[in-house]
Amino acid sequence: MQVKWLDVKNSKIYQERGIWKSDNSFVNRVIQIESGGNPLAVAGYPKGTSNMIIRNSRAAGLFQFIPSTGKMYGLKLEERFNPEKSFEAFKLLVRDNISALAKHNIPITATNLYLAHQQGAGGLKAIWNNINLGTPIGMAIRMNMNNNKRPEVPKDAPAKDWYNAWDKFIGV
């Protein structure tokens, strides 16, 4: 049985009152978390910035692709700000993340797919492997991702608490 939110390939994005959204609950949640529906969003600058050094070095666009990941999925630097092109790249990334999760026997859930988007599939695998060990999240999370901790979870909390907070926050 196909889970409706998992059908990212056939989902659509659209603009409503200046905010980009999707007809797919998972895609819509990712857009909401990553950019608030603003295709010009740059990490640390939610309304966007015209500074080219910042624009070219940070996560950007609806799905907050970093330059290297965007390039892997066919996006030129400025195309990260194009909602349709960014969405096509996101669909490919989701496809690859589903394959990576399956390969590592990690359940295909909205939370796991989002965290694979945020942390990379390898980063999620590291967190997943530490969930039941009581490892503090600061030791399990990728070092460049420390800003992605949930504010309600102390920095020395176990990885499981961090994961559960994200699971509740994703809510798909």
Regions of interest found by a model, annotated:
Residues 1-20, 24, 39, 50-52, ...:
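N-terminal export signals and maturation junctions of secreted/periplasmic proteins
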Residues 21-51, 65, 90-92, 111-121:
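Short, functionally critical alpha-helical segments immediately adjacent to catalytic or ligand/cofactor-binding
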Residues 41-43, 81, 128:
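Short loop/turn and capping residues at structural boundaries
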Residues 42-72, 133-137:
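Short, surface-exposed glycine/acidic/tryptophan-bearing loops
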Residues 50-51, 99-105, 143-150:
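Short, charged low-complexity linear motifs
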Residues 62, 67-126:
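Alpha-helical segment that forms one wall of the substrate-binding/catalytic cleft
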Residues 111-171:
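Catalytic and substrate-binding regions of cell-wall glycan-acting enzymes that process beta-1,4-linked
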